[in-house]
Amino acid sequence: MKRHSKIVAIQGDSLNSINRKTDTTLLLALEAQRRGYKIYYYETKSLTLVKDKIYALSKEVEFYENKKNFYSIKNLKKIDLSKTTFILMRQNPPFNMDYITATFLLEKISKKTRIVNDPFMVRNMPEKLYSIEFLKLMPPTIFTRSIDEIEKFKKKYKNIVIKPTHGYGGKNILFINKSTNKKKISKYLKKHNHIMAQKFLPQIKLGDKRIFIIGGIIKGAIRRIPMKGSIVSNIGQGGKAVKTILTKRELRIAKIVASDLKKNQIVFA
């Protein structure tokens, strides 16, 4: 493989796990193909370091927009990742040691090829913990593993939600009110360790807004509306995406976050 020929390597979960209706990885791959790039796809378990090179046993894949089977595997090849044009880190959490190890390996070649997002920053800015930088712009929020702290938080705000610090996609979100017993919360903490707790905002039933930021520029937004009877708006949990526009306040907040993301070399957010 020639150095920096038009190749995009995608580090992701199993190809079969891609949801063609909701997964932006597919859209990125299709656009790369339209621009003449070959696509190689691999999972973190395929990463290998030998001397100073990082290899991945990768599938050369062609993606399709309108076919029943949205991809075909053309070839299986061990590639030197430093010779690709771009590497897209697209695997979902959990933010575990496998995830972290992959960032260390990719960091070794980050000066030889463009990795999106930067593996050092991905490791040091996990999504929910990164929000600590913007607590003044958020509903009341705490991070804790203490049942007593959660009870105090619940007493103050009546209705709260808790979610795993390193979770994603609206999974394992728990609504808590005065009738939620300690045993249930303790069991949750035992399973998920440190959690993020927030004051519950009733207006979530009308939806939230997902803002897309590329290179520090706000590119668009959607409103995600929960299923009837749900408080979780994530599309992967049954939420529906509709067109929206940002209010002046939302735009002001988004610009603050976008500026910080650009400073920290987070290209896609």
Regions found by a protein language model. Give the residues of each.
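Extreme N-terminal starter segment of soluble prokaryotic enzymes
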Residues: 3-9
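Conserved N-proximal alpha/beta basic substrate-recognition cap immediately N-terminal to
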Residues: 5, 16-143
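Redox-cofactor binding/interface segments in oxidoreductases and associated redox assembly factors
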Residues: 10, 88-89, 198
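Extended, domain-scale alpha-helical bundle/helix-rich regions
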Residues: 12-14
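Flexible, glycine/charged-enriched surface loops at secondary-structure junctions
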Residues: 42, 264-269
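Rossmann-like NAD(P)H-binding beta-loop-alpha module
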Residues: 136-158
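Phosphate-binding site of ATP-dependent enzymes
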Residues: 148, 155-158, 166-264
